[in-house]
């Protein structure tokens, strides 16, 4: 069984220590009552992987681990087969001892769009909401973060994360918890909170923004990446049954409307820093994700539209700040 005790020990003497009042019981309940039918199979694949210590580890420019001498062909094939038992791989890519996990998404492209606009991550404690298999958390560590905590209830993603961690030398600077944000108390302890690719899946997007704010320390930075549509501050698309074949898409605002929502929730210094149409080069079917992908979700006659006739996916990045309080300012002045 995946062991979370290292994380509990790590936060016991940190600003996250009050999370221990609820977190162990939540994780124990998940382990007892909520495991996916294939979880044991996925977990066994992780258990059979060797714990390798990289001779060269690059998390700044990619997620790449290399050994001093190449693995034998048989050893490499065994690792690759175990990793393929954890398909589909959606977020990446990873290069692990000569095994290239070519994921559905080029998440490195998103990171390169986001990174120039971030406050320096050096020494920061970070929360990544809806973190998937944890690719961006490793990039956050590469950019100097002290600790990256991801939450995502999808259990396959947890096993993929643990597999990668094991091949990175059991690195304890990043941790993934199988929770949704609605299960977190108001921790108010993270220097930076990321929510990328989550907002449009929420039935109540403003509640999600408040939940993100509740996790930030005063003066902390929110990094929000989500689907948007063209339009002014009054423009919001509410799709019917599906959007790009996804059933669980509820609200897609314009970037201007989203900026107004953030300000309504009390964020300051709200900035739209990037907008980019998602291409079929960035999201596509691969050897590691063999089912339908973006090309199947767009109108074959007009790729500016989804198969349902809505505008094709356009993603914006917005940066915002949680205001300081008198108490936080006084503490910093000491």
Swiss-Prot record:
Carboxy-S-adenosyl-L-methionine binds at residues 91, 105, 110, 130, 152-154, 181-182, 196, 200, 315. GO terms for biological process: tRNA wobble uridine modification. Its EC number is 2.5.1.-. It comes from the Bacteria. Keywords: Transferase, tRNA processing. It is an enzyme of class 2 (transferase). The keyword NADP does not apply. SUPFAM superfamilies: S-adenosyl-L-methionine-dependent methyltransferases (SSF53335). GO terms for molecular function: methyltransferase activity; transferase activity, transferring alkyl or aryl (other than methyl) groups. HAMAP family: tRNA_carboxymethyltr_CmoB. Catalyzes carboxymethyl transfer from carboxy-S-adenosyl-L-methionine (Cx-SAM) to 5-hydroxyuridine (ho5U) to form 5-carboxymethoxyuridine (cmo5U) at position 34 in tRNAs. Belongs to the class I-like SAM-binding methyltransferase superfamily. CmoB family. This is tRNA U34 carboxymethyltransferase. It comes from Klebsiella pneumoniae subsp. pneumoniae (strain ATCC 700721 / MGH 78578). The gene is cmoB.
